[in-house]
Amino acid sequence: LPLTIDGITTDRALDYITLSFAFAVGQVMWGFANYIGGMIADKYGDEKALFLGIILAASGCFLIPFCDTTIEIVIAIGLLSAGGAGIAGLAVAMSAVNKKVPEKKAGLAFGVLNAGGSLGQTFLAPIGVIIIINFGWVFALNCLGILLLLTLPFTYFLKDQKVRKQSKIDDQKTDIYMMI
């Protein structure tokens, strides 16, 4: 997203300070959304948390070109894109991988996951610049949104057979039964 700043400030009625504020809100939201993503993953499953995060991040990418006011850009960048990226972040992805691989291969799986994320970031920036130069920032954001949506089918394979939905009351009942 930062690669599109010049295009946004040129084509929209937004200045650099407004965009900086939207990205600052996004940084706070991203950190907070990591916790939300973890809670969603614990209660409903990793695949649902990743699915929701991807949808939010993609919707933010698609909405950015239509933003003309501060509140609109803060919602698109700061809440939707960053919030979605936080919910579907590395912590939830690692949790999903941890449930799918044997314990002896967990280190390798985490390494591959981290390396894949770094490799993606390494290639996405120059490809994004090429797309922006040749086709414009709006097309680049739409490509990013589509790329995010293309990852949605992979969330199906992360579906956990058993999602724990125990409450504290259930845990207390179990403790009482164990004492008896």
What annotation goes with each model-predicted range?
Residues 13, 45, 66-68, 102:
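Helix-breaking motifs and short loop linkers at transmembrane-helix boundaries and internal kinks
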Residues 27-35, 122:
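Residue-level signature of mid-helix packing/kink "hotspots" within the transmembrane helices
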Residues 33-45:
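Helix-to-loop junctions at the C-terminal end of transmembrane segments
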Residues 55-68:
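C-terminal ends and interior cores of transmembrane alpha-helices
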Residues 72-88:
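Hydrophobic core of transmembrane alpha-helices in multi-pass small-molecule transporters
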Residues 87-101:
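Intracellular juxtamembrane helix-capping segments at the cytosolic ends
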Residues 113-163:
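Helix-loop-helix hairpin linking two adjacent transmembrane segments in secondary transporters
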Residues 159-178:
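Flexible cytoplasmic inter-helical loops of multi-pass small-molecule transporters
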